[in-house]
Amino acid sequence: MSALPFPHLSISLHTAAILTGRSVRTWQRRIEEGLVPRLGDGVRALVPFEAVQQSMEGVPGEAANAWSAQDVQTLVRADQGEALAQAQMGSQFALLALRGAAPATPPAPGHDAGRIAHYFLERAAEQAQADAMHWLGLLYAAGLGPAGDASDADADNNAMALMWIAKAAAHGHAIARQQLTALLPNLPNLPAGGQA
């Protein structure tokens, strides 16, 4: 391996699998074969971000050199369960997915920005992160269900979009409140509060 640009940053095998499209078992096997160093925090197996970065090289929109030091630090915090960092990572991949929602060349297998966005946004939403809920609503409204592509049924996507936007509004997300009011004008005024 050459000099590592992010020498002490590591992520879980599961997050490595999500980002690269390689299975957790593949990452375990690469560790067993000595191809990737196994790091640990005492609780879970971790791999250096550089190993994940090398596995992502050549993937449009997610190329290894597209990661700034700040992006990697946010990724590490998201992997550790920080809701705001999960929402930030999810929103970055959601933007990639939404830009690619129009008919275009499909992403390489396993490197689907929509699927990665759902992974991080769902974890942040489980922690009541309103921005993550809103982003999930936007993904579903664009026809991008958890598979990350437009193959899901439109009715299901529309229902999920409405549900996530309503949840974001209930958690105080200002834009989601306005969207919900525009969709359902006969609703009583939604209370302000929560997080925006």
Predicted feature residues:
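Polyanion-binding surface elements
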Residues: 1-24
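Short helix-capping/linker turns of helical repeat alpha-solenoids
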Residues: 34, 80-83, 96-100, 127-130, ...
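Structural signature of tandem alpha-helical TPR/SEL1-like repeats
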Residues: 64-73, 99-120, 146-164, 189-195
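Hydrophobic face of amphipathic alpha-helices that form TPR/SEL1-like repeat modules
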Residues: 88-100, 138-143, 182-183
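TPR/TPR-like (Sel1-like) alpha-helical repeat modules
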Residues: 155-175, 181, 185
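Short helix-start
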Residues: 10-12, 31, 35-62
